[in-house]
């Protein structure tokens, strides 16, 4: 079965968001900076989404630098090109910090059920 990933417009769910989430072809939601005021609000939003459809994939494009949608109360991850520059002179160090950065991102997102 094919599933759709949708987005929502604001900081909370409105009736039209709820109806779209309930649609059987919706399998995921991608969140953006516009959906995050602070960590507490974001957690409430995720809880409200999970109440509608528990097994929904909730995603975010959050890899560091300007591609870090959630900023306040999240670790500031440098842009990935920094790791590439380090890699040119010290491959082992670059791999280590890239892996650690990935773990930080994963832990912070998992902590809020993403």
Question: In which residue ranges do the predicted regions lie?
Answer:
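Boundary/entry segment of secreted carbohydrate-active catalytic domains
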Residues: 1-14
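N-terminal glycine-rich anion-binding loops that anchor highly charged ligand groups
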Residues: 13-27
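Enzymes and membrane/adaptor proteins characterized by extended Gly/Ser/Thr/Asp/Glu-rich
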Residues: 25-114
């Amino acid at each position: 079965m094919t599933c759709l990933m949708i987005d929502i417009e604001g900081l909370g769910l409105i009736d039209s968001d709820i109806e779209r989430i309930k649609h059987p072809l919706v399998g995921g939601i991608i969140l953006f900076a516009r959906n995050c005021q602070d960590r507490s609000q974001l957690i409430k939003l995720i809880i409200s989404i999970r109440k509608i459809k528990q097994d929904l994939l909730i995603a975010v494009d959050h890899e560091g630098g300007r591609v870090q949608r959630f900023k306040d109360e999240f670790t500031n991850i440098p842009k990935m090109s920094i790791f590439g520059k380090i890699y040119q002179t010290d491959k082992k160090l670059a791999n280590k910090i890239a892996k650690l950065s990935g773990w930080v991102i994963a832990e912070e997102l998992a902590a809020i059920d993403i």
